[in-house]
Amino acid sequence: MYVLGIGAANVDVHGMSRAAIVMRDSNPGHLRTSAGGVTRNVMENLARLGVEAKMVSVLGDDLFGELVKSESAAAGLDMSESLTLPGVTTSAYVSILDERADMLVAMSDMSVLEHLTPAVVDSKRELIRGAAAVVCDPCLGAETLERILDSAGDTPVFLDPVSTAYARRAAPLAGRFYGLKPNSLELAVLAGMDTDTDEGVERAAASLAERGAKCVAVSLGERGCYFAGAGGERFYRALRPVGEMRNATGAGDAFLAGLVYGFVKGMSPEDAVDCALAAGHIAVESDDTISREMSALLLKYTIRNYSDKG
């Protein structure tokens, strides 16, 4: 049983200021470089949780591409189905964090993903249909996203909308995904509804479930998650806050990995959301985008120690 990721794999460069950011000036801080990409990060988290994880992406024949492949292999993520193309540059993502580890601004160059075409998806059709689940992101073109859904058959497809801009690309297809993991802003775009209040979030999430999405897990930051399922499930879920937030950039990727982990393990929606929240907790307590401590055992420990059930 394996989970397949189709989407972004890139190099992340994160800068965290040592003091309050001074705009339009050089700020002393700490810089870290690592393999990244929304879908790749989700898949590495799954690999660290003990799930067989495979990845389809496009890399350049360059140093960044080699870094992505070597770090992924070291974590147990199989990149052998990905393409390495000469003459193109591996995608990159740069983020700037303030002294409290909150992201101020980010920039990405994902143009290499233009080479991950519907034809590439067609060539991976059997791989897609053999997966327990597929994870993708809208950094891919709209036609490629649609081809993934067309090719999946009965294989559940999960999507991280990534941002409000990318969510617009996925919005017309939102009801065809098995699982969606938006924040409230991305939810507003996917559903075409206001989400400024709790009632708005609930209505928007329910509308996506009514359109066909089986699992809508809305990330609410420190407030946890609101879940709407096709089976009528509607609930809020949260864990107690972590002691120290060290890096918030990987929390969303870990959250989706925890959700997919719970799904492929056959858990109830409540338990799967607990896995998602716990994975997010583990991520924010790490200096790295993906915690090197991520494991199924630590996931269980975190649920036990941070939930009201503990």
Segments predicted by a language model, with ranges:
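Glycine-rich phosphate/adenosyl-contacting loop at the front of the ribokinase-like
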Residues: 1-58, 63-77, 244-245, 309-310
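Conserved phosphate-binding/catalytic region of the ribokinase-like
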Residues: 4, 27, 171, 198-310
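Short, conserved phosphate/pyrophosphate- and ester-handling motifs at nucleotide-, phospho-/glycolipid
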Residues: 46, 183, 252
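A glycine-rich helix N-cap at a beta->alpha junction
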Residues: 74-87
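Conserved phosphate-binding/catalytic loop of the ribokinase/pfkB sugar-kinase fold
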Residues: 84, 95-133
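Short beta-strand scaffold segments in enzyme catalytic cores
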Residues: 92-96, 105, 224-228
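Conserved beta-alpha-beta core of the PfkB/ribokinase-like small-molecule kinase fold
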Residues: 133-203, 223-225
